């Protein structure tokens, strides 16, 4: 787990993603959710920016509860994401240096839940995490996930 009192010591990597979120829930959160779920899991930090030196810095979310409600709405909407694998314990408002952020801990999806994808098309909406980025999976990788999960005989 991260030491939130020393957030500036962390960098984005294959398990940490910072998102500004001052203008609302970023659309790119779904790619990161899919990528973390289909990889080793990770933590999304809403209300955190990555500075030029790559260090992380807490912003101050004006209404973090609204962001959480928006996130839950998307997680429960099959038009947004194929499956919700989060529990209420995975999402939390934290205060860092007097600033409110939201942490979203995304566990790795169980093999029989994979792939976790955006929208209705697993071939176009499945992502994996590599380094600091979320990358769309190739159709071959998606079909392999589906075979492993028992979702198709492709």
Place the predicted regions along the sequence by residue.
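Conserved N-terminal catalytic/coupling substructures associated with nucleotide/phosphate chemistry
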Residues: 1-154
């Amino acid at each position: 787990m991260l030491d939130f009192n020393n957030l500036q010591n962390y960098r984005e990597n294959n398990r940490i993603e910072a998102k500004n979120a001052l203008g609302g829930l970023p659309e790119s959160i779904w790619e990161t959710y899919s990528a973390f779920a289909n990889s080793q899991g990770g933590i999304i930090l809403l209300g955190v920016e990555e500075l030029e030196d790559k260090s992380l810095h807490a912003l101050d979310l004006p209404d973090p509860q609204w962001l959480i409600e928006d996130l839950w709405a998307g997680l429960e909407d099959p038009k947004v994401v194929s499956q919700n694998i989060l529990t209420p314990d995975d999402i939390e408002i934290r205060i860092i240096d007097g600033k409110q952020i939201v942490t979203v801990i995304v566990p790795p999806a169980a093999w029989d839940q994979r792939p976790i994808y955006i929208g209705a098309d697993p071939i176009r909406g499945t992502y994996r995490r590599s380094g600091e980025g979320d990358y769309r999976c190739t159709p071959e990788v998606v079909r392999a996930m589906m075979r492993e999960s028992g979702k198709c005989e492709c």
